């Protein structure tokens, strides 16, 4: 097995886990924080919007079974890449979108994907999703891990609200 790691910030990490977690070739999806200026941030620090971190998922995947481009497709299917203020009902800098690359190949694939996306969407706004070098990933508290499995009713409600928000746009 050849395991690689990818990092995506797509708003609330509760809503970002399941879309990736359900595919063969995805070994593990971990909720956490990346991009800020505080070591070992807590959820409360990140939630306040002052730590500089984005809620992020770390995805460990088998490159023989799953491509980075497929990860990009999934990521962009569940976010609004034009939203500068967060994602859907989740507002604030900690919910902004970003692709954190771990090597030049991931960076190039992300840049190419966004260029293609620009050509396919009809929008007056620029793509808000940033492409940034990966930095220290801090695993979120245990109660955030596998949220959709531990709290299916609350997860379903979050997804319903998110879908209603999408439909209004």
Curated annotation (Swiss-Prot):
PANTHER family tied to this protein: PEPTIDE METHIONINE SULFOXIDE REDUCTASE, PEPTIDE METHIONINE SULFOXIDE REDUCTASE MSRA 2
A matching Pfam family: PMSR
Residue pairs linked by disulfide bridges in the UniProt entry: none
GO CC entries: cytoplasm
Catalytic activities: L-methionyl-[protein] + [thioredoxin]-disulfide + H2O = L-methionyl-(S)-S-oxide-[protein] + [thioredoxin]-dithiol; [thioredoxin]-disulfide + L-methionine + H2O = L-methionine (S)-S-oxide + [thioredoxin]-dithiol
Family: Belongs to the MsrA Met sulfoxide reductase family.
Listed name of the protein: Peptide methionine sulfoxide reductase MsrA 1
Species of the source: Staphylococcus aureus (strain NCTC 8325 / PS 47)
SUPFAM superfamilies recorded: Peptide methionine sulfoxide reductase
Keyword Oxidoreductase: yes
Keywords linked to the UniProt accession: Oxidoreductase
GO MF annotation, one: L-methionine-(S)-S-oxide reductase activity
Biological process per Gene Ontology, one example term: cellular response to oxidative stress
Top-level taxon in the UniProt lineage: Bacteria
Gene3D superfamilies per record: Peptide methionine sulphoxide reductase MsrA
Enzyme Commission identifier(s): 1.8.4.11
Family matches, as InterPro entries: Met_Sox_Rdtase_MsrA_dom, Met_Sox_Rdtase_MsrA_sf
